Amino acid sequence: MKTFVAKPETVKRDWYVVDAEGKTLGRLASEIASRLRGKHKAEYTPHVDTGDYIIVINAEKVAVTGNKAKNKVYYRHSEFPGGLKSITFEKLIDRKPEMALELAVKGMLPRGPLGRAMYRKLKVYAGAEHNHVAQQPQVLDI
C-alpha cells in the first residue's frame, strides 16, 4: 500500500466562523493554527496546504489569564538605531483588537512560503460582523 500524498489542486477547503468572545487567547490560537494547517483532516500532508479558511469574530473580547493584560508586552523594531517599540496587551486590544490574535496564530504556523499561505486563510474581525457571508461559513465551536 502506497503512502497517500495530498495534491494542492484536489484539496477541499471549507469556511468556518469562530466566536472569540470570552475564549483564552493561546488556547484559541493553537486550535485555529491546527485547523489552518489541516491537521484535523485525514489527508493531512506536511508539505501541502490542506487547511481550511477560518473567520474569527469578536476578537476584541478575547481573554487572557492572570495579569497578562497589563504585563504581556509585544515588541517590534524599525531596524534603525533606538527603534525598539513596545506595547502592552491592554493597549494593543484598544488600538488594534485583531492584532493580538493574528500575532498569536502567526507564531504557531511554520515559517516560509507555506506558512504565509496558511496565514492568508485567517480572517480576523474586531466586532461581530464579517463580510464573508457569500462563502456560507459553518459555525465552529472551540
UniProtKB/Swiss-Prot annotation:
One of its GO terms (molecular function) is mRNA binding. GO terms for biological process: negative regulation of translation; translation. InterPro entries: Ribosomal_uL13 (IPR005822), Ribosomal_uL13_bac-type (IPR005823), Ribosomal_uL13_CS (IPR023563), Ribosomal_uL13_sf (IPR036899). GO terms for cellular component: cytosolic large ribosomal subunit. SUPFAM superfamilies: Ribosomal protein L13. Coiled coil: none annotated. The keyword Protein biosynthesis does not apply. PROSITE patterns: RIBOSOMAL_L13. Pfam families: Ribosomal_L13. It comes from the Bacteria. Keywords: Ribonucleoprotein, Ribosomal protein. Belongs to the universal ribosomal protein uL13 family. PANTHER family: LARGE RIBOSOMAL SUBUNIT PROTEIN UL13M (PTHR11545:SF2), RIBOSOMAL PROTEIN L13 (PTHR11545). Part of the 50S ribosomal subunit. This is Large ribosomal subunit protein uL13.
